[in-house]
C-alpha cells in the first residue's frame, strides 16, 4: 500500500503513560475528532491478547474516520488486526523481513536518524520514515536530537513521505518549515493535552503550514 503524504500531516502516537481520567479509546477518538491523519498504537504494557483486543477496537475506530492505523513494532498484532501499517525502529525487525511477513498491502514505516539509515530503509521497502528526534523530548529521556540540517538532508535524499518526531509541540512545530517533512508525529503534545480535540485542531492548522 502506497503511503500518501497527507497521512503524515498530524500523526498521533499513543502512550499509556498519558491515560488519566479517560480511556485510551476515548483519547484516540478525541484526537480523530480534532483531525489527526494517522494513528499509531504503541503498547509496551499489555499482554498479547489484551494488545490484540485494543488493536481491533482502535482500528475499527480509525476506520470510522477514514484514518490509517499503524501498529508499533509488533508484526503479529499488525497482521492479526489487519492494520494499514506497521512501524519499526532500528532495533526491531528489518524492513525487508517485515515486508516478507506482511506482503505488499501493508505500509511499513521505519525510524531513522541519518541519511544512511534512510536510504537503507527505502532500499528494503519502507513506505514512510519517522525521523528524529527533532527536538529534546520528555517521552524518551535517552533520545539523541538530530544534528543541525539532518532532517532536511534526509528529506532531500528520499522520495517517500517523512514525518518528524521527538519533542514537537505548538511552540516549536513551525521551526520544521523548510526541512521538507510532510508532517509531525506527536505523543505528549496530543495525549498529554487537557483538551485533546481542541489541541489537535490547533496542531493540524500549524502542520498544514509546513
Feature annotation, model-predicted:
Residues 1-93, 100-128, 146, 153, ...:
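Conserved N-terminal beta1-alpha1 strand-loop-helix module at the mouth
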Residues 108, 131, 139-142, 186:
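Glycine-rich, flexible loop/turn motifs
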Residues 41, 78, 135-141:
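A short acidic, helix-capping loop that chelates divalent metal ions and anchors anionic groups
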Amino acid at each position: 500500500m502506497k503511503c500518501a503524504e497527507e497521512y503524515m500531516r498530524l500523526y498521533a502516537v499513543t502512550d499509556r503513560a498519558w491515560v488519566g481520567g479517560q480511556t485510551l479509546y476515548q483519547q484516540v477518538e478525541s484526537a480523530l475528532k480534532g483531525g489527526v491523519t494517522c494513528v499509531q498504537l504503541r503498547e509496551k504494557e499489555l499482554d498479547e491478547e489484551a494488545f490484540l483486543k485494543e488493536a481491533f477496537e482502535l482500528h475499527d475506530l480509525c476506520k470510522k474516520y477514514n484514518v490509517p492505523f499503524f501498529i508499533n513494532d509488533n508484526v503479529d498484532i499488525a497482521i492479526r488486526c489487519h492494520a494499514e501499517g506497521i512501524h519499526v525502529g532500528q532495533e526491531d525487525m528489518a524492513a525487508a523481513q517485515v515486508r516478507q511477513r506482511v506482503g505488499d498491502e501493508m505500509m511499513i514505516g521505519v525510524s531513522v536518524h541519518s541519511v544512511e539509515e534512510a536510504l537503507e530503509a527505502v532500499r528494503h521497502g519502507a513506505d514512510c520514515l519517522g525521523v528524529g528526534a527533532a527536538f529534546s523530548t520528555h517521552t524518551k529521556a535517552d533520545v539523541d536530537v538530530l544534528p543541525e540540517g539532518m532532517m532536511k538532508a534526509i528529506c532531500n535524499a528520499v522520495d517517500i513521505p517523512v514525518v518528524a518526531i521527538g519533542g514537537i509541540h505548538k511552540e516549536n512545530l513551525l521551526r520544521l518549515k523548510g526541512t521538507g517533512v510532510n508532517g509531525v508525529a506527536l505523543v505528549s503534545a496530543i495525549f498529554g493535552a487537557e483538551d485533546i480535540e481542541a489541541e489537535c485542531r490547533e496542531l493540524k492548522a500549524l502542520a498544514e503550514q509546513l
